[in-house]
């Protein structure tokens, strides 16, 4: 199990890379994360949802994503509330304090998922969340040491040297955590090193001496990781330097933005710049396309959009004939109204939309979770639905997409410049991307996004084989586990 000295130390990428490296060695491997908190989710083969990182790790293992790979998923809706997903299904909404009290009761379900995976493969590579050093969260923990001790899984601690202070982070973690938790840690990995690793030899030895743990290696900065789907909001930034020769695509960063990995394929296109617009900045007037992304709290994010003045920028863009694409929550915002009579996003509420599509949305209890395929803009696509709303109105008579089963999705305005769709993953298909970019007079490169992700995973796996003692990690993972595994083995 990889745990970190903090968030964003690179655990997700390391797990994905290790999964691919072990698969290439001929082992049957599966990923697992007991508890994740993310608004970037993926639909699984068994019709549920899990964190995007675990779906990527499944790809690295060359298997279909399954809800057992991430049994507990928290999707933040507001500063103090999250939607609770257990085994891929919505179980309710919890406040921060409620979850801290309730999470211990979920340990049995977490262990049930882990044990099913363990029986189905040679090695389960587990990813922790945040850090075990957050000792204020230790009681009832199911994400890090609470799980590791219950399941008897050895832990390797990951430290991020790029942010500085890695010696203190690793040695400090050892100092403050419970001795029984310390006993679970079998070593450490230094991640995100830039330059010659030999320059850190003394520091590496000092960590080994001060912690009493062995080091498994120093991983360099992995540039290939930038080509993988994004999960954490910390990566929201422009993909490359601006150039006047490239058309600009702008996307505002909403407070509860979700599934923003929808936009990742655009980073591969040399004819466009994807600019993620942070709060406090206007949407650039030179944008050829504005994309309104998914949202976990659509009405609140629509209010935030207006508070930033982005609605004014969007209306001006529309008057100039610019293109606008709304995805899921962004699609709902483009309509005339959004109603949440039963308070699925918090308290019961309603809001006027931007009115650029003649449609109205009502949120309801049923959550659509399914893979879909069909035609959009004359091009084939594959993607998935993940939403809790029903949208109707005159503009749906000109749908954005028609599914293979004949169902219609989304809407297009009468002028043919505003598009809305509930489908995530649309832009991963090269032909659809080409059709959209041609509306901007941009010739798409036809890059196979899926192949690009596969190549990036192979590159990362090769780097880990070179810089980590994977033989020792395999031996650690294959070592005999405790004779009895706690509750959940047969659930």
UniProtKB/Swiss-Prot annotation:
GO process terms (BP): cobalamin biosynthetic process
Keywords (A to Z) from UniProt: Cobalamin biosynthesis, Glutamine amidotransferase
Matches recorded under Pfam families: CbiA, GATase_3
Active site positions: 328, 424
UniProt key word Plastid: no
All copies of domain GATase cobBQ-type, residue ranges: 246-432
Coiled coil location: none
InterPro entries in the cross-refs: Class_I_gatase-like, CobQ/CobB/MinD/ParA_Nub-bd_dom, CobQ_GATase1, CobQ_N, CobQ_synth, GATase_3, P-loop_NTPase
GO MF term list: ABC-type vitamin B12 transporter activity; catalytic activity
Pathway(s) per entry: Cofactor biosynthesis; adenosylcobalamin biosynthesis
Sequence similarity: Belongs to the CobB/CobQ family. CobQ subfamily.
Classification via PANTHER family: COBYRIC ACID SYNTHASE, DETHIOBIOTIN SYNTHETASE
Function, as annotated: Catalyzes amidations at positions B, D, E, and G on adenosylcobyrinic A,C-diamide. NH(2) groups are provided by glutamine, and one molecule of ATP is hydrogenolyzed for each amidation.
Full protein name: Cobyric acid synthase
């Amino acid at each position: 199990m990889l745990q970190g000295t903090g968030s964003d130390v690179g655990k997700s990428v390391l797990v994905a890379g290790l999964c691919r490296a072990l698969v290439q060695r001929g082992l049957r491997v599966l990923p697992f994360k007991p508890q994740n908190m993310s608004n970037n989710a993926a639909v699984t083969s068994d019709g549920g949802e899990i964190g995007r990182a675990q779906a990527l790790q499944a790809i690295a293992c060359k298997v279909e994503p399954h809800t057992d790979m991430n049994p507990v998923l928290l999707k933040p809706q507001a500063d103090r509330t999250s939607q609770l997903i257990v085994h891929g299904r919505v179980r309710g909404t919890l406040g921060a304090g409620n979850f801290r009290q309730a999470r211990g009761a979920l340990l049995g379900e977490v262990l049930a998922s882990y044990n099913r995976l363990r029986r189905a493969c040679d090695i389960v590579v587990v990813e922790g969340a945040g850090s075990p050093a957050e000792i204020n969260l230790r009681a009832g923990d199911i994400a890090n040491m609470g799980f590791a001790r219950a399941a008897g899984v050895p832990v390797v601690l990951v430290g991020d040297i790029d942010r500085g202070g890695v010696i203190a982070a690793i040695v400090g973690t050892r100092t403050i955590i419970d001795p029984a938790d310390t006993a679970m840690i079998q070593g450490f990995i230094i991640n995100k090193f830039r330059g010659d690793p030999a320059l850190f030899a003394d520091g590496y030895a000092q960590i080994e001496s001060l912690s009493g743990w062995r080091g498994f290696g120093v991983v360099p900065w992995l540039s290939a990781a930038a080509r993988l789907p994004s999960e954490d909001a910390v990566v929201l930034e422009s993909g490359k330097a601006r150039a006047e020769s490239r058309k600009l695509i702008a996307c505002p960063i909403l407070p509860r933005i979700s599934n923003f990995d929808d936009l990742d394929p655009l980073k591969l296109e040399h004819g466009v710049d994807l600019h993620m617009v942070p709060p406090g900045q206007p949407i650039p007037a030179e944008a050829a396309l504005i994309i309104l992304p998914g949202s976990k709290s659509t009405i609140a994010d629509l209010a935030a959009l207006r508070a930033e003045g982005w609605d004014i920028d969007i209306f001006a863009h529309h008057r100039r004939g610019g293109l606008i694409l709304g995805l899921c929550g962004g699609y709902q915002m483009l309509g005339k109204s959004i109603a949440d009579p039963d308070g699925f996003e918090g308290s019961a509420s309603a809001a006027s939309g931007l009115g650029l599509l003649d449609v109205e949305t009502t949120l309801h209890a049923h959550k659509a979770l399914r893979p879909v395929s069909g035609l959009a803009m004359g091009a084939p696509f594959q993607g998935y639905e993940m939403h809790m709303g029903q949208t109707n109105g005159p503009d749906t008579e000109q749908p954005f997409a028609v599914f293979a089963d004949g169902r219609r999705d989304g809407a297009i305005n009468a002028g043919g410049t505003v598009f809305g769709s509930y489908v995530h993953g649309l832009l991963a298909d090269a032909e659809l991307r080409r059709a959209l970019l041609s509306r901007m007079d941009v010739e798409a490169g036809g890059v196979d996004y899926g192949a690009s992700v596969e190549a990036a995973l192979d590159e990362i796996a090769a780097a880990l084989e070179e810089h980590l003692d994977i033989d020792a990690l395999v031996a650690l993972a294959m070592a005999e586990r405790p004779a009895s595994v706690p509750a959940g083995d047969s659930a």
